[in-house]
A protein has these predicted regions:
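Active-site neighborhood of HAD-like aspartate-dependent phosphohydrolases
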Residues: 2-51, 68
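An amphipathic alpha-helix signature
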Residues: 30, 34, 58-63, 78, ...
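Short, acidic loop-to-helix structural element flanking the phosphoryl-transfer center
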Residues: 4, 10, 87-112, 118-122
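Helix-loop "lid/cap" segments that line or gate small-molecule binding pockets
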Residues: 36-37, 57-72, 124, 158, ...
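Short helix-capping segments at alpha-helix termini
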Residues: 39-43, 69-72, 129-133, 162-163
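Asp-based, Mg2+/Mn2+-dependent phosphohydrolase catalytic module
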Residues: 1-12, 104, 117-231
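Short beta->alpha linker loops
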Residues: 28, 53-57, 80, 94-98, ...
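Metal-dependent phosphoesterase signature
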Residues: 43, 63-101
Length: 231
């Protein structure tokens, strides 16, 4: 057994983020978000968009826009942005390569916990055919007081799934998500297989947060879980 499983408790639950982990949605989401921001009168490039907004809830994003950029999108703009995004998801959203096979082979229970609203998570899973793997084990930042990088969402998911935090493994693609998992006292595997996460700079940023490990291919995950379980 390698260092990742030599001393840790065996995993009792895997908590997947959704965007950029289960579905390759981040480039689509960023396209719509930055377009909406441009309509409001500010230009933010893609790199800055990912740095500022990746992995954060809509409530957190709108607060960042107010405090850092002086932009108040307003409810009408937010509703229009959501409509555009959902239409784009229905046309273009794809699952992360290999994720269906990975979920089918997982040796431990799992759920999804995302900064997105519940409606969006369900749409993402429906469009990509992943919904049956999760059933009702879907948790949204709208269910807790604070979104990522606060630990609330992951702790809520663990409580609902009746697993202690130190037996949870979080799969995350964003710095905010990695920070949230660590704050929840959970192990976290940083995933870099999404199309938005290919740059060395993104991987380096995740590594500075010291996740349990960084991995690129979803097909490796069931084996990592078996290794941690000692099988």
């Amino acid at each position: 057994m390698s260092a990742i499983g030599a001393t840790a408790l065996p995993p009792g639950l895997v908590i997947f983020d959704c965007d950029g982990v289960l579905v390759d949605s981040e480039p689509l989401s960023m396209r719509v978000l930055l377009g909406t921001i441009a309509e409001a009168g500010a230009l933010i490039d893609v790199a800055q968009g990912y740095e500022s907004f990746l992995g954060k809830s809509l409530a957190s994003i709108t607060e960042i826009l107010r405090t850092d950029y002086g932009i108040d999108l307003g409810s009408h703009a937010v509703d229009r942005m959501r409509e555009r995004l959902y239409a784009l998801f229905r046309r273009e959203l794809r699952p992360i390569p290999g994720i269906a096979e990975t979920l089918a082979a997982m040796p431990v229970p799992f759920c999804v916990a995302s900064s997105s609203q519940l409606e969006r998570i369900r749409l993402s899973l429906d469009v990509t055919g992943l919904r049956p793997y999760f059933g009702d084990h879907i948790f949204s930042a709208s269910m807790v007081a604070q979104g990522k990088p606060a630990p609330d969402l992951f702790l809520h998911a663990a409580r609902e799934m009746r697993v202690e935090p130190d037996r949870c493994i979080v799969i995350e693609d964003s710095p905010a998500g990695v920070a949230a998992a660590k704050c929840a006292q959970m192990r976290v595997f940083a995933f870099t297989g999404g199309s938005h996460a290919q740059s060395p700079a993104h991987r380096s940023l995740l590594e500075t947060l010291e996740p349990t490990l960084v991995f690129e291919h979803m097909a490796a995950l069931p084996g990592l879980m078996r290794e941690l379980a000692g099988n």
